[in-house]
Regions:
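Conserved class I S-adenosyl-L-methionine
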Residues: 419-452, 472, 550-573
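Glycan-recognition and catalytic cores of secretory/periplasmic carbohydrate-active enzymes
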Residues: 98-420
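A short glycine-rich, Lys/Arg-flanked "PGG" loop and its adjoining helix->strand segment in the class I
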Residues: 533-545
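A conserved beta-strand element that flanks and buttresses the S-adenosyl-L-methionine
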Residues: 521
Length: 611
């Protein structure tokens, strides 16, 4: 292998270059310390600049020294007319290459959203699958919390209206063909309607029906479900026609019906609802313990059961149950559709990822999530199942010839809970304090002071982390009222200032009504939002007209300057300015916000005045 490189700097930084360039390609080190001449680093000879000067033009020279000496050596080489790169140049190129090689994760999300846009019916409902393109009440129902979570409030409202419009007089809902009522389907619809009811309460969500009418419909639906409950706690659905055989699905999935009833019990102070939930839970835990512990159903339906246990607080039982699928994933690389096959149900795999994320198991969650993402079709959808080419005799018989609507929903949920689990895991690494002289903080403080309203103002820090900015602002701009929102309550627990209101939320689902805040800012958080336009729309929704939205984040032109997360994105200055301009009358950009004493254009500030 030809030796084509010379490293300038025979110290720590010079040695670190060997992470990026094979030693076989390095001719020698060069150093200004003449005492190092004739020594070696990692078996590579070291020469003094004085003795090596005339040969340097024959090689690619890379400067690898601390910032203290970097300018001096650049000047030295420039004077000799010797071209060079720096260690940072090499690092940046390596990170850029790594980013270019990673899967197109953001594209997976964008294609999934395009699939939803293409496969809903007039904005009223989601289809069953591409082979049966009719509205599916059950899935339309449990799409609603997902749409709200990702900031698609109008579509969620439209879905909710359609579901109330088609509710039967007895409170039930029927299947896709409008043939039979189902306890399970009705409960999934209630998940959506309860999510709307809670959003009305928290955010003033605009809905076609009055709160009174919505409350009436929700309670009527729950009363119908509970009318199918036996004294022992069993829920008996009027029809099981769509369930398939007992190997595929059984009534233990009724555990997945209980969460909306729990939420309704709180909303309406219905102790009788909670008492019946407790009885139903105990019945299915006792009657179906073998199926629960030993992966007794199709992974999609099995995951309904285990996620329900997590949501109902039965985490120990859920962890015990997941040992079976954990073992299978270790053996064949993914969770199979059934415990004794080698093909995969895409929805079940995303659901398994969700369960692991909710239990804080990122390792298994990420493995399941990545495998399921790889099954996405170019359309943005997923087939119900995919064959395993290593087992050609096995037939994947779960909707293998159509893209099913529910997989897209569970992909979006898995991505949300992945982000939440990631931030919980990283809690210890977040900054709790910033110097008052940090350029990013100075921009926030200056913009806030410029916009201070007589009598005080409401300020939102969204993606607040440990509240480092708020901590400083309480001292520097004490006349404002501060609110903190973050996806991780674990991270927010570090905010100890009692005057700060804290709520769990995300950039695409901020738990406040329209026009609540005078000044909204987010720093190094938009890069994690995935759906940037949805996040900007939400930032502007909760900010008053003529109020300020401030985004501080990284410039895409500097991509490669540091490692980034799988789902992270940096921003083209004009592109983000254009997105904000849809919701703001004017958007200013500061293209060089300093950080840690450095001003290199990595950070920008976009400042918008809301329409």
């Amino acid at each position: 292998m030809k030796k084509q490189y010379v490293f300038f700097g025979a110290g720590f930084w010079g040695q670190s270059l060997l992470q990026y360039i094979p030693r076989e390609q390095v001719a020698f080190y060069v150093d200004n310390n003449e005492q190092k001449d004739g020594t070696a680093v990692e078996g590579i000879p070291v020469r003094s600049f004085k003795n090596a000067r005339d040969e340097l033009r024959n090689y690619k020279v890379i400067i690898a020294v601390s910032n203290q000496y970097l300018f001096e050596i650049k000047k030295q080489l420039d004077a000799e007319g010797i071209p060079y790169e720096t260690l940072q140049d090499v690092k940046t190129a390596a990170v850029k290459e790594k980013i270019a090689r990673r899967p197109d994760y953001l594209g997976i999300y964008q294609r999934a959203m395009q699939w939803i846009n293409k496969n809903n019916i007039n904005g009223n409902c989601i289809i069953n699958n591409t082979r049966v393109p009719k509205g599916y009440p059950e899935v339309t129902g449990y799409y609603i919390p997902t749409l709200l979570r990702w900031g698609y409030r109008d579509l969620a409202a439209s879905f909710g209206k359609w579901l109330i419009d088609i509710q039967k007089p007895d409170g039930s809902w029927y299947d896709t063909e409008d043939k039979d009522p189902y306890v399970f389907d009705s409960a999934q619809i209630l998940k959506g309607l309860v999510a709307i009811r809670k959003s009305i309460q928290e955010t003033g969500f605009s809905f076609a029906y009055s709160e009174e009418e919505l409350d009436k419909r929700i309670q009527k639906g729950i009363d119908w479900i509970l009318s199918n409950m036996k004294k022992n706690g069993q829920l008996v659905t009027p029809s099981e026609a769509e369930w398939g055989d007992k190997r595929t699905c059984s009534e233990v999935i009724h555990l997945y019906c209980l969460q909306p009833i729990v939420e309704a019990a709180k909303l309406y102070n219905r102790l009788d609802y909670q008492e019946k939930v407790d009885k139903i839970l105990e019945y299915y835990k006792e009657k179906y313990i073998d199926d629960i512990l030993h992966f007794g159903l199709l992974s999609h339906f099995y995951s309904y059961v285990i996620e329900a246990l997590v949501d109902l607080g039965e985490t120990d039982l859920a962890r015990k149950a997941m040992k079976t699928t954990e073992k299978l994933m270790g053996e064949i690389g993914f969770v199979p559709a059934y415990r004794d096959v080698h093909w995969c149900c895409s929805t079940g795999l995303f659901q398994q990822a969700i369960i692991w994320y909710k239990l804080g198991d990122l390792e298994h969650g990420d493995k399941a999530f990545a495998y399921a993402c790889g099954m996405q079709n170019a359309s943005g959808g997923w087939y119900g199942s995919d064959a395993n080419p290593n087992y050609p005799d096995e037939v994947n018989d779960y909707i293998s010839d159509a893209e099913v609507s529910w997989t897209v929903k569970y992909f979006l949920d898995a991505l949300y809970f992945k982000n939440k689990a990631d931030f919980n895991a990283q809690a210890s690494g977040f900054e709790q304090e910033y110097p008052h002289t940090d350029g990013r903080y100075e921009v926030v403080k200056a913009e806030l002071k410029e916009n201070v309203i007589a009598g005080g103002m409401n300020v939102l820090d969204i993606g607040c982390g440990k509240g480092a900015y708020i901590h400083n602002l309480l001292k520097d701009v004490p006349e404002a009222k501060y609110t903190a929102v973050d996806i991780s309550t674990k991270v927010m627990s570090f905010i100890q200032d009692e005057v700060v209101e804290k709520k769990e939320g995300s950039l695409t689902e901020i738990p406040y009504p329209n026009d609540t805040f005078d000044f909204t800012y987010t720093t190094e958080a938009l890069e994690h939002a995935v759906d940037i336009e949805s996040a900007v729309r939400e930032l502007c929704r909760v900010t008053k007209s003529d109020g300020t939205v401030l985004v501080i984040d990284k410039n895409k032109s500097h991509l490669g300057q540091m490692e980034i997360c799988e789902w992270e994105q940096w921003f083209d200055v004009k592109e983000l300015q254009g997105i904000m301009s849809k919701y703001c009358t004017k958007v200013r950009v500061n293209q060089n916000v300093s950080y840690n004493g450095v001003s290199d254009g990595l950070f920008c500030a976009w400042i918008g005045t809301v329409k």
